[in-house]
C-alpha cells in the first residue's frame, strides 16, 4: 500500500486498541492495530490479539466482540512489547481519541513491562 499525499518528516503510526475496559491503570489491551505510514509513502499494517492475563468483562466483549476464548492462546503484552516498541521506534503517534485513551493505555502497558522500553520523548 502506498500513500503519496502525506509529507512526513518521520513515520506516523495510527493506533487503535481494544481493551478489557476504560480504566488505564487497571485494564489491559486485548488487540492492537497499527497502520504505520513511512516517509517513503509505504504503509505497514500490523494487527495482533493479546492475552490480557485477566478475564474480559462481558460488557466490553459486547462492544468489541472479543471474548476470553479468542485470546486465551495469544501472547501477553510482555511477550510482544519489544517487537512492538521496535515497530513504533521513531514514529509520531495518532488515532481517534488517542491522546485521551489509546496512547495513555499503550504507555501504561509498556510501563508495566519495562519503563525504558518505550519512550514518548520527541513524539507528536
Predicted regions and their residues:
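Conserved non-catalytic scaffold segment of RNase H-like nuclease domains
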Residues: 1-122
Amino acid at each position: 500500500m502506498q500513500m503519496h499525499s502525506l509529507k512526513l518528516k518521520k513515520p506516523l503510526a495510527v493506533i487503535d486498541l481494544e481493551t478489557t475496559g476504560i480504566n488505564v491503570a487497571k485494564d489491559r489491551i486485548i488487540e492492537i492495530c497499527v497502520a504505520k505510514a513511512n516517509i517513503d509513502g509505504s504503509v505497514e499494517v500490523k494487527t495482533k490479539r493479546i492475552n490480557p492475563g485477566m478475564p474480559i468483562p462481558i460488557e466490553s466483549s459486547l462492544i468489541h466482540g472479543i471474548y476470553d476464548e479468542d485470546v486465551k492462546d495469544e501472547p501477553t503484552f510482555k511477550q510482544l512489547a519489544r517487537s512492538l516498541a521496535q515497530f513504533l521506534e521513531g514514529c509520531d503517534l495518532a488515532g481517534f481519541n488517542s491522546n485521551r485513551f489509546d496512547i495513555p493505555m499503550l504507555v501504561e502497558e509498556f510501563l508495566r513491562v519495562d519503563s525504558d522500553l518505550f519512550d514518548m520523548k520527541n513524539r507528536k
